[in-house]
A protein has these predicted regions:
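Bacterial Sec-dependent N-terminal signal peptides
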Residues: 1-23
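A long-range scaffold signal marking pre-active-site subdomains of enzyme folds
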Residues: 20-360
Length: 360
């Protein structure tokens, strides 16, 4: 895996029989406050464009809120169905076993690995979130966004918090880090970001996109996970969603993980694993399963009712993780999907195993 780039595209999928569309009444357009409050280095952000609320932190902590709670929330504004999730990569350099990634302990830090193998942090290395219609959001849409990102109620949102949401969208759009690997619409296919020629940030015609980069380049942090030394592995995360709360796409968060081995040795016999601690409302009665034909791992409530969801008048939701396009390997005559493009001569690997443990 030396200097090779692997793409994994997956999806977090939720469903609820009684899920309702979020209501965002129209009000003033192009509302602006003052002063500007964009943050140069936000630590957290979330996908909250459809019916799913899904938190991310710049160091690859995933589905966990800034206040330490469950960070997969479905439907938005109601109960949670994911407490924490992450990705693990394991393999050998020579006869030395390495494992990098995130579980309850995080073995990654925010930042990328430069050509000299050094960790680069600060400056433009942070978490970004864009929304393509941010300039035309209504007063109520901004207020709802501010409530969710500040973990407060709509009635408690301040003008300053609303302004910060707008300013952050603008700052992230204007400073979208294509030079670090963030996706954009390359109209002339030359690999160069040229906004003056109409090229814009984004992927897959999504309405909202998050991008950030993390790595296993910090020795102490990597060792805290499983006692291993770093691989020199860079993780570039792109997440996106669609403003379709009443349609199927509105129940999905897409996640693309770009893995780049910037170490000096090949990583062999490598495995990539997604893991999750799903808490479907009350965590004490959840079940899990897998559909091997779909590479779909899922969790659901053990009964027709759940106290957390009942508080909102809802039946309990279910949640699943699907490999839409797993890691690729050479395979003559086949065609893989990588970076949302067809790649002849390769195939995508499906999920090869599934495991679970019970705790609590």
């Amino acid at each position: 895996m030396k200097n090779l780039k692997y793409m994994i595209t997956g999806a977090l999928i939720a469903s609820s029989i009684f899920a309702k569309d979020l209501q965002e009444p129209s009000s003033w357009n192009n509302i602006r406050f003052s002063p500007k409050l964009a943050t140069d280095d936000p630590a957290y952000t979330l996908i909250n464009i459809g019916n799913f609320g899904y938190w991310q932190k710049y160091d690859a902590t995933s589905a966990h809120t800034p206040s330490g709670g469950s960070g997969g929330i479905y439907p938005r504004g109601t109960a949670a169905n994911v407490y924490l999730d992450g990705v693990l990569v394991g393999g050998y350099t020579g006869d030395v076993l390495h494992v990098s990634g995130t579980i309850y302990t995080n073995g990654l830090v925010g930042g990328y690995i430069d050509d000299a193998g050094d960790l680069q942090q600060g400056g433009d290395v942070r978490i970004y979130r864009i929304r393509k219609n941010y300039e035309s959001l209504t007063f109520d849409q901004v207020r709802l966004d501010a409530a969710e990102i500040n973990e407060t109620t709509v009635s408690s949102v301040s003008d300053a918090q609303m302004q910060a949401v707008l300013d952050q969208y603008e700052a992230d759009w204007e400073n979208w880090p294509t030079h670090l690997g963030a996706p954009f619409y390359d109209l002339d296919s030359d690999g160069v970001y040229e906004p003056e020629d109409g090229e814009t940030p984004g992927i897959a015609d999504a309405d909202q996109v998050i991008w950030y980069v993390a790595s296993d380049a910090d020795v102490a942090t990597t060792a805290s996970l499983y006692g291993c030394t770093p691989i020199g592995l860079e993780f570039q995360f792109t997440l996106w969603g669609y403003n379709q709360p009443g349609a199927a796409l509105g129940q999905i968060v897409f996640k693309n993980i770009r893995l780049i081995n910037k170490g000096s040795e090949d990583l062999t016999e490598a495995y990539v694993s997604l893991w999750s601690d799903p808490d479907v409302g009350d965590y004490t009665n959840d079940f899990v399963g897998v559909d091997t034909s779909l590479s779909l791992m899922f969790s659901y409530n053990g009964g027709p009712d759940d106290n957390d969801y009942a508080a909102f008048g809802l039946a309990p939701a279910a949640v699943g993780y699907d490999f839409f396009a797993g890691p690729i390997v050479e395979s003559a005559g086949d065609t893989a999907i990588s970076n949302l493009q067809k790649l002849p001569g390769y195939r995508n690997l499906p999920a090869s195993s599934f495991g679970y443990f019970v705790a609590g």
